[in-house]
Amino acid sequence: FLPLLILGSLLMTPPVIQAIHDAQRG
């Protein structure tokens, strides 16, 4: 469960969220 938790927290960091939004926008 720990690796999943770390991965989840990494995905919730602002730079990653911004990158995801940019990717979805095209």
UniProtKB/Swiss-Prot annotation:
Record keywords, A-Z: Amidation, Ion channel impairing toxin, Neurotoxin, Postsynaptic neurotoxin, Presynaptic neurotoxin, Secreted, Toxin, Voltage-gated sodium channel impairing toxin
MF-aspect GO terms: sodium channel regulator activity; toxin activity
Post-translational modification: The glycine-PoTx is a non-amidated form of poneratoxin, with an extra-Gly at C-terminus. This loss of amidation does not alter toxin activity on Nav1.7/SCN9A.
Taxonomy, superkingdom: Eukaryota
Tissue: Expressed by the venom gland.
Compartment(s) of residence: Secreted
Primary localization: secreted
Residues recorded with modification Arginine amide: R25
GO cellular component: extracellular region; host cell postsynaptic membrane; host cell presynaptic membrane
Presence of the UniProt keyword Magnesium in the record: no
Additional remarks: The variant A23E has an 8-fold reduction in potency compared to delta-paraponeritoxin-Pc1a. The variant D22N/A23V, has an ~5-fold increase in potency compared to delta-paraponeritoxin-Pc1a.
Protein name, UniProt field: Glycyl-poneratoxin
Organism: Paraponera clavata (Bullet ant)
Lineage, top ranks: Eukaryota, Metazoa, Ecdysozoa, Arthropoda, Hexapoda
